[in-house]
């Protein structure tokens, strides 16, 4: 049985929550969760404390059976054959089906056909950082991580609500989040706290402008007039920060619900801009960078913090430490500062989620 299942099974047999086990063992709840999900290999002191609380020996509690070091799929491939990336996240070696990313074509680590895997001889899985998020400029950060630390980055395109569960399950090192709140900068901390709980921290990347990417042929020049007009909108998936912005923009009193105002749904900011530029829609919500890159007009609606959420259990991981250093470097700040709509004055700041 795997380390993950054995620890969790014994805890559940006693009817204990992770918080209860943490209290009885003197280990933090975040660390209990990380060890259960194999995101963290326990220290000798932690292993002894957990074993003592559960009335087991360390050997019984943490014995790994059946090749525990083997790589496993982070999530099932959608096709029977294709390419995969490999990365170590915490204590686990994970395989990721290759998918489109904001970084273009990232070299793969092997191919698969049904259940047969054919890895490449040279593999970068120990030197790979996995981020789930939607920053269209992530390539600026990844280029510095490659140059300074020799790290490869796998940037999975995910909305905030889709990225956070991947982080909770120990499938990525960091999750991008932008969650507007009427209270201002508390939005990201609030959504992480309510979705994941404590044991996480936010690394600030930038405060960006989000608004309406608009075809130049549309003469409306205010968001309130846009909301009343009968133009064609391109949507975003539920759970994304951009969709929440669109819902607020279109969902005023007496108006048709936002979901009934569009036929097409884009998967990211550039997808929205491309749909408008290609004539599939007249408008959609995206960050200013994506709109200007596509030659579109832009009406600003709000400013949002874009943060990278990382678990406390991985803060001493080599690739996560490199991520923090890169965000605090003047090189990355200067690159992002030159982008339209990005405010980098607080880049690299760290906030613990209570």
PLM region spans:
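N-terminal hydrophobic or amphipathic helices and topogenic motifs
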Residues: 2-3, 8-12, 16-20, 27-162, ...
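Flexible hinge/capping segments at coil-to-helix
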Residues: 205, 214-233
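Periplasmic-binding protein-like
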Residues: 199-211, 296-325, 342-351
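Short helices/loops that flank or line small-molecule/ion binding pockets
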Residues: 161-175, 179-180, 265-280
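Short beta-strand-to-loop elements that line the ligand-binding cleft
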Residues: 152-159, 257-269
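Ligand-binding cleft/hinge of the Venus flytrap
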Residues: 140-149, 224, 236-264
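A ligand-binding cleft/hinge motif common to bilobed small-molecule-binding domains
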Residues: 176-193, 273-302
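Short loop->beta-strand "edge-of-pocket" segments that line small-molecule binding or catalytic clefts
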Residues: 124-134, 224-244
């Amino acid at each position: 049985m795997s380390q993950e299942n054995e620890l969790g099974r014994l805890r559940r047999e006693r009817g204990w929550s992770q918080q209860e086990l943490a209290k009885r063992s003197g280990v933090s709840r975040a660390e209990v969760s990380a060890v259960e999900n194999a995101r963290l290999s326990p220290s000798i002191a932690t292993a002894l404390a957990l074993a003592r609380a559960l009335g087991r020996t360390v050997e019984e509690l943490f014995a790994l059976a059946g090749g525990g070091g083997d790589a496993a799929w982070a999530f099932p491939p959608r096709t029977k054959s294709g390419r995969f990336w490999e990365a170590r996240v915490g204590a686990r070696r994970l395989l990721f089906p290759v998918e489109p990313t904001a970084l273009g074509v990232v070299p793969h680590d092997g191919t698969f056909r049904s259940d047969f895997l054919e890895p490449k001889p040279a593999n970068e899985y120990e030197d790979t950082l996995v981020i789930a998020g939607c920053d269209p400029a992530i390539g600026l950060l990844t280029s510095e991580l490659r140059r300074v630390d020799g790290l490869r980055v796998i940037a999975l395109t995910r909305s905030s609500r889709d990225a956070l569960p991947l982080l909770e399950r120990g499938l990525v090192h960091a999750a991008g989040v932008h969650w507007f709140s009427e209270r201002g900068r508390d939005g990201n901390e609030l959504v992480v706290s309510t979705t994941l709980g404590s044991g996480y921290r936010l690394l600030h990347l930038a405060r960006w402008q989000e608004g309406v990417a608009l075809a130049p042929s549309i003469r409306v020049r205010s968001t309130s007039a846009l909301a009343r007009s009968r133009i064609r909108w391109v949507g975003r998936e539920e759970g994304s920060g951009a969709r929440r912005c669109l819902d607020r923009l279109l969902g005023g009193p007496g108006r048709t619900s936002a979901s009934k105002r569009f036929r097409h749904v884009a998967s990211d900011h550039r997808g929205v801009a491309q749909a408008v530029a290609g004539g599939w829609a007249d408008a959609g919500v995206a960050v200013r960078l994506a709109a200007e890159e596509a030659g579109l007009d832009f009406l600003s609606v709000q400013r949002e913090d874009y943060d990278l959420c990382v678990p406390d259990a991985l803060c001493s991981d080599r690739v996560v430490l490199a991520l923090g250093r890169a965000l605090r470097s003047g090189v990355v700040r200067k690159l992002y500062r030159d982008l339209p709509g990005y405010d980098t004055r607080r880049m690299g700041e760290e906030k613990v989620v209570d």
